[in-house]
Amino acid sequence: MSPARLRPRLHFCLVLLLLLVVPAAWGCGPGRVVGSRRRPPRKLVPLAYKQFSPNVPEKTLGASGRYEGKIARSSERFKELTPNYNPDIIFKDEENTGADRLMTQRCKDRLNSLAISVMNQWPGVKLRVTEGWDEDGHHSEESLHYEGRAVDITTSDRDRNKYGLLARLAVEAGFDWVYYESKAHVHCSVKSEHSAAAKTGGCFPAGAQVRLESGARVALSAVRPGDRVLAMGEDGSPTFSDVLIFLDREPHRLRAFQVIETQDPPRRLALTPAHLLFTADNHTEPAARFRATFASHVQPGQYVLVAGVPGLQPARVAAVSTHVALGAYAPLTKHGTLVVEDVVASCFAAVADHHLAQLAFWPLRLFHSLAWGSWTPGEGVHWYPQLLYRLGRLLLEEGSFHPLGMSGAGS
C-alpha cells in the first residue's frame, strides 16, 4: 500500500490520539495524568561548597558554552536581553539601574522555574538575585554576566545553610551550569539563545553499539529500520524488538552527552541529558519496577539495568560525567526500549513519563505495521515527535518536561 493511500489512516490515528490524550491531560486539572502511578519524590542531594554541575568548565559545550562578547546598552545584541519583573524574585539592584533584572530569555525561564522550586522547598522564602547582567565591568574577563547569561543567587533569608540545596534546585530548574562558588552566593549560567547545543533532545552517539538478533554488535549509525535489536519487554525481561524509525538522526552534529558509568558489572553509556534511563535506588527492585529518569538526574549510588548472564541485572552507578561527541541517533523500537552498550534505556526523551510516550507513539507503530518497507532513514528530527512535543507543551504540566526540551521542537 502506498504512503499516499495510507495518509488518511494516519490522520485518523492522530485524531484518535488527541481524543485519548486530551481527557487524560485535562480530566484532573493541574494534577497528574489519570492512570499514571504516583512516585515518591526524588531525594535532592545538595551541592558541596565549590562543587559545580555539570563537572566541566563553565564555558565548554557540555555546560553553558563559549563567551560571545559583552553586551552594552548601545549594542545591537542588547535586544536579546529581557527584564524580569517576577514578584516572587527579589533583585538586589545595588546599582539602582535595573541591570540585575536584565537577562536572556533562557536565563529568565530557568530563574522563574527556580523561584517556584524555592517557595515550594522553603515556604515563606523567596529567591534573591544579587548579580545579573553587568554593564560596569565588575566581573572577570569574559564573564557570562556581561551577556545576561549568568546570575548570582541566594535565598531571601540569606541562610547560608540553604545554599547547597539551592544550588541543587538550580540544577533541577535547568540551568546549564551551576557553581556553589562562594559562601555568600551560588552562581548559575545558561547557554546562549542560538547555541547549537541549547536543546539536546534524546540521542546516543553514532558509535554506541546495540546487539542484533543474530548476536552481532553494530554501531547505531549502521542500524536500519527492520533490524531487530536487544530491548526490554514490559515484564522487565530481555527481548528482541523491531527498529521502526529514527526519531532523530544527525550524523554530522556535535552533541553534549551525559556519561553514566557503572560497576559490578562495569558499563559505560553516553546519552543526551534529556533522554530517559531506567533507575532504582536499590538493587533489590525487580526490573519491571525500575522508573524512567532523565539522564541528567541520574546520580552515583543509584542502580541502572544492564545486560548480564542471564537476563537483565542491576548495576550500581559509579560515576556521572559529560562528553562531547559527533553524531546523534535515536531509534524507536516496537517495545519503546533498547539496550545500548549493554545498558537498558528508553527510546524516549524530553517528557518524563515513559509509558505515556509509548502510548502516544502507537499511531506511528500502526502506520509502520501497515506500510512495512525498506525505508532509508532521513536526517534530523522526525516530524511526529516534534508534533507530540508541541501538543504536550499545551496539555501537560511544565514539570512533565526536561528543561532542555527537544532539538528542533521550536519550544
Swiss-Prot record:
Organ and tissue specificity: Expressed in embryonic lung, and in adult kidney and liver.
Keyword Iron-sulfur on entry: no
Record site: Cleavage: 202-203
Sites of N-palmitoyl cysteine lipidation: 28
Binding site for Zn(2+): 145, 152, 187
Residues with glycosylation annotation: 282
Protein name per Swiss-Prot or TrEMBL: Indian hedgehog protein
GO MF annotation list: calcium ion binding; cholesterol-protein transferase activity; patched binding; peptidase activity
Record's subunit section: Interacts with BOC and CDON. Interacts with PTCH1. Interacts with glypican GPC3.
Species annotation: Homo sapiens
GO biological process, one term: epithelial cell-cell adhesion
Residues flagged as site, Involved in auto-cleavage: 272
Signal peptide positions on this chain: 1-27
Effect of residue 100 to N: In BDA1; decreases the stability of the indian hedgehog protein N-product
Keywords assigned by UniProt, alphabetized: Autocatalytic cleavage, Calcium, Cell membrane, Developmental protein, Disease variant, Dwarfism, Endoplasmic reticulum, Glycoprotein, Golgi apparatus, Hydrolase, Lipoprotein, Membrane, Metal-binding, Palmitate, Protease, Secreted, Signal, Transferase, Zinc
Family, per entry: Belongs to the hedgehog family.
InterPro entries (UniProt xref): Hedgehog, Hedgehog_Hint, Hedgehog_sig/DD-Pept_Zn-bd_sf, Hedgehog_Signaling, Hedgehog_signalling_dom, Hint_dom_C, Hint_dom_N, Hint_dom_sf
Entry superkingdom: Eukaryota
Keyword Lipid metabolism: no
Cited SUPFAM superfamilies: Hedgehog/DD-peptidase, Hedgehog/intein (Hint) domain
Entry's EC annotation: 3.1.-.-
Binding residue positions for Ca(2+) 1: 94-95, 100, 130-131
Essential for auto-cleavage (site feature) positions: 275
GO cellular component: endoplasmic reticulum membrane; extracellular matrix; extracellular space; Golgi membrane; plasma membrane
Gene3D superfamilies per the UniProt record, alphabetical: 3.30.1380.10, Hedgehog/Intein (Hint) domain
Site (Involved in cholesterol transfer): 248
Record's disease association: Brachydactyly A1: An autosomal dominant form of brachydactyly, a group of inherited malformations characterized by shortening of the digits due to abnormal development of the phalanges and/or the metacarpals. Brachydactyly type A1 is characterized by middle phalanges of all the digits rudimentary or fused with the terminal phalanges. The proximal phalanges of the thumbs and big toes are short. Some BDA1 affected individuals exhibit short stature.
